[in-house]
């Protein structure tokens, strides 16, 4: 095991990998409850949605560990599942959920081809170092914001958009406890501190009524959503994937999902890489091609399984911060997904308040890259700023990256330095511009 996963070579241990895997799993475990809810809204049976979510995540997370040997876990991506449910199935498009999964699968196939041709890595290499740092910083703010919002520390406001929540509420109290424990253990350099904070906050939440207790157990698996793109649409004789080509307008959604997957993963991998010590100070990720290959295949597998697009999870950074350095942590995460396909109510006990501390600390750790940006050089600093602000403020990693790319190209153009912009940056920026226009 040590030789295969290079555990000692990367100054890790089996214990660190297990703790890192547990931390990552708990930080991303909300997807077990959230994704099926989204897919049920789209018309999929709950049991099928739960099985697809857990088994799809397990397969691709383990594949990432075995093939790329990096602590990068995968599951159904937030954002794309919302597009599937509320735009494709319930919005004006109003297609059957099987057709939506066919669109997701096609998007994954296209990305896989682009990665195989080296285009995705080439785009990453074309991104200026300042923007690579900005992506990680923006994601850090995004993660911290998600933690604070989910924990009731920050709440929505009609007058000011956001405001301070009721800190005397049980939800906020558990969140504050989680943050305090996570920060204190980080200061004391306690291994597995983030995991300890999640478990401790979950226990504290029981008497306060914040931690939901299991009321029933689901021991069955339902694979009826698997091969969804090749299933016949109810009431017709048409296979779902054929319907996509019978309605050419649906191919625009293939492009839209592709843009989101393409750049979300780039930002996530850089962010996790810097926490897991496999990305350098300029955001260049070591041995990135296998990571991108598995991630691109995951999108297609997600559509095939009926789980929506499966993608790398930025919550993997919490596991990396807890000590994960190899793919062994992915094996832990993958096996836990399989287990909780049967025992989903247990994961339901981990509330957003319990994970608040881990997400806030990870967000803090990711802000350290601010020091690597030359803030005196506005040609590079402003695009970085646009990216950093755009990610949390639009609740989208893709949008933030798009703001950074487009502003960088425009600034270099008007200052007469267009020749310094690499061709793929022009292409990517134009693609983002098209995406924003069509949105």
List where the protein language model places each region.
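Transmembrane alpha-helix interface/packing and boundary motifs in multi-pass membrane proteins
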Residues: 60-72, 183-189, 256-264, 295-305, ...
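Helix-loop-helix junctions within the multi-pass membrane cores of secondary transporters/permeases
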Residues: 2-35, 56, 77-139, 272-370
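Loop-to-helix transition at the N-terminal end of transmembrane alpha-helices
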Residues: 42-62
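Internal alpha-helical transmembrane segments of multi-pass membrane proteins, especially GPCRs
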Residues: 51, 102-105, 255, 293, ...
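Helix-loop-helix hairpins and the membrane-proximal interhelical loops
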Residues: 1-48, 162-164, 196-289, 433-434
